[in-house]
From Swiss-Prot:
Lineage: Bacteria, Pseudomonadati, Pseudomonadota, Gammaproteobacteria, Enterobacterales
Protein role: Negatively controls the transcription of the yiaKLMNOPQRS operon, which may be involved in the utilization of 2,3-diketo-L-gulonate.
UniProt domain HTH iclR-type: residue ranges: 23-85
Keywords assigned: DNA-binding, Repressor, Transcription, Transcription regulation
Stated name of the protein: DNA-binding transcriptional repressor YiaJ
Comp. bias regions, Basic and acidic residues: 1-20
Domain annotation IclR-ED: ranges: 100-272
Gene: yiaJ
Region annotation (Disordered) ranges: 1-21
Length: 282
């Protein structure tokens, strides 16, 4: 028991040396927020303390401060805590400040009405696709688990594969090597071998669209296309999610046409003009 406490203290001291002076409580509070974001139904104080590498009294004091500001509340389970919906309001304000949302939203809403399906819009951040806008289906019954602000892996999502396909040629191999421990089969359809992914990305570049064929979740399919900026880069992607059974009924071609038109409209507003080497979305 004594060794565990000493080890925890040494870990805390090592981390604190790397932080700017006077910011210890801020860093610790933000760390608790990030941990709690993975426990929507609440996390017990003891487990939260263990995950944070802090003693219970310190965690409890920080939680009290977050509670007083309205960001944390007690969960139904005794001794557990969870985040409040105040984060939704804060996140929405941050997202609304992004010009891309104002540019893309009208086009995405029109696509949502035209298809009746779930519409997703993401940006690229390092080795993830981040969902920054989402519209629920108007006619389809499927409600996906994806949420605004979610970091999605590149290898098993349609929009993620778009970023890999239209990114730097050397990036994919580097990504594969550095994320080998994360690249695991989520379903029997998940691509986990690099040669197979190279083939997949070549097809995506040729067709201008990416598919998630139940690679992330059984029963759910997704079609994505790139959004180009004025420099011909792909900072964003738009996709349609729906049940695999409904996709078979509607047909890929019937969804690809309005999806491509939407991506083209957003790309045009970002200053992109179609070139022979980047004409895939037309």
């Amino acid at each position: 028991m004594g060794k565990e406490v000493m080890g925890k203290k040494e870990n805390e001291m090592a981390q604190e040396k790397e932080r700017p002076a006077g910011s210890q409580s801020l860093f610790r509070g933000l760390m608790l927020i990030e941990i709690l974001s993975n426990y929507p139904n609440g996390c017990p104080l003891a487990h939260l303390s263990e995950l944070a590498g802090l003693n219970k009294s310190t965690v409890h004091r920080l939680l009290q401060g977050l509670q007083s500001c309205g960001y944390v509340t007690t969960a139904p389970a005794a001794g557990s805590y969870r985040l409040t919906t105040k984060f939704i309001a804060v996140g929405q304000k941050a997202l609304s400040s992004l010009n891309i949302i104002h540019i893309a939203a009208p086009h995405l809403e029109a696509l949502n009405i035209a298809t009746g399906e779930t519409i997703n819009f993401s940006s690229r951040e390092d080795d993830h696709a981040i969902l920054i806008y989402k519209l629920e289906p108007t006619t389809g019954m499927l409600r996906t688990r994806a949420y605004i602000g979610q970091h999605m892996p590149l290898y098993c999502s349609a929009m993620g594969k778009i970023y890999m396909a239209f990114g730097h040629p050397d990036y994919v191999k580097s990504y594969w090597e550095s994320h080998q421990h994360e690249i695991q089969p989520l379903t029997r359809n998940t691509i986990t071998e690099l040669p197979a992914m190279f083939d997949e990305l070549a097809h995506i570049r040729e067709s201008g669209a990416a598919m998630d064929r139940e690679e992330n979740e059984l029963g759910v399919s997704c079609i994505a296309v790139p959004v180009f900026d004025i420099h011909g880069r792909v900072p964003y992607a738009v996709s349609i999610s729906l049940s695999t059974s409904r996709l078979k009924q509607v047909g890929e071609k019937n969804l690809l046409k309005p999806l491509r038109e939407t991506a083209q409209a957003i790309s045009n507003e970002l200053g992109f003009t179609v070139r022979d080497d980047l004409g895939a979305i037309t």
